C-alpha cells in the first residue's frame, strides 16, 4: 500500500476497492503481507509453569512501524495465539512473538533438600540451606534451543546474607535481582537436570519469609 506519514501517525492507501458491510460493526481488511525468516526457540519459567513456550524471533519486515495493540499470530496458516504488542516496532527492528505452549517439552522443579544449621557460641546465627532440581525432558525429534529462567532470594538487609552455591559462574547467567538464566541446546529426546543451591544466613532472633 501507499503510506502517508503524518506527524504522529501513518495513513495507508489501500489499492482497489473493498466491500465493507453496512452493519455498524468493525471489519478488518488486509493492508500488507510479507514473509520473513524467523528464529524459533523455547523459553520456560519452571517456578511459574511446567510448560515450555515456543517463540519466534524476527525483524519487522514492513517499511512502516507495527503499532502497539492486539496481534493474532498464525503458524503455517493456522491460528496459534493472540499476544499484545506493548510498544511500537520500527521497520527492521527485532521483535519476539510467543507461539504458545509445546506439549513435547516437560519441565518440573522440585525441592531436593532443605535443612537448618546454627553457628556461633554466644549469639547464634541461623543458616537455611536449599537445593532444587529442574528436570527438562524433550520428546522432540530434533535438536532445540531453550532458555530456562528461575530465581534465588536477594537480600536488601545487611543482617541477611544469601550465598548462591550452584550454578557456578560460566554455567548460567545471574543478575543482581536474583534471576538465573540458562541457554541450553537439547538433543532429540534428551533429559537434562539443572541444580540450584543456595544458603541464607541471618541472626537467630530475626524472622524472615518468602525464601521459597
Locations of regions flagged by a protein language model:
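Intrinsically disordered, low-complexity Ser/Thr/Pro/Gly-rich interaction regions
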Residues: 1-133, 140-161, 166-167, 174, ...
Amino acid at each position: 500500500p501507499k503510506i502517508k506519514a503524518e506527524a504522529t501517525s501513518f495513513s495507508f492507501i489501500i489499492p482497489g476497492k473493498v466491500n465493507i458491510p453496512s452493519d455498524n460493526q468493525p471489519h478488518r481488511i488486509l493492508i500488507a503481507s510479507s514473509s520473513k525468516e524467523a528464529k524459533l526457540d523455547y523459553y520456560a519459567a519452571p517456578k511459574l509453569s511446567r510448560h515450555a513456550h515456543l517463540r519466534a524471533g524476527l525483524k519487522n519486515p514492513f517499511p512502516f512501524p507495527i503499532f502497539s495493540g492486539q496481534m493474532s499470530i498464525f503458524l503455517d496458516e493456522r491460528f496459534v495465539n493472540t499476544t499484545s504488542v506493548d510498544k511500537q516496532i520500527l521497520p527492521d527492528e527485532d521483535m519476539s512473538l510467543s507461539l504458545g505452549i509445546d506439549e513435547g517439552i516437560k519441565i518440573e522443579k522440585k525441592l531436593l533438600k532443605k535443612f537448618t544449621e546454627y553457628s556461633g557460641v554466644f549469639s547464634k546465627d541461623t543458616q537455611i540451606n536449599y537445593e532444587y532440581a529442574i528436570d527438562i525432558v524433550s520428546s522432540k525429534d530434533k535438536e532445540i534451543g531453550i532458555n530456562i529462567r528461575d530465581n534465588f532470594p536477594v537480600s536488601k538487609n545487611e543482617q541477611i546474607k544469601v550465598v548462591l552455591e550452584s550454578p557456578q559462574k560460566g554455567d548460567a547467567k545471574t543478575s543482581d535481582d536474583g534471576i538465573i538464566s540458562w541457554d541450553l541446546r537439547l538433543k532429540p529426546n534428551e533429559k537434562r537436570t539443572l541444580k540450584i543451591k543456595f544458603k541464607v544466613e541471618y541472626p537467630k532472633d530475626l524472622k524472615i519469609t518468602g525464601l521459597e
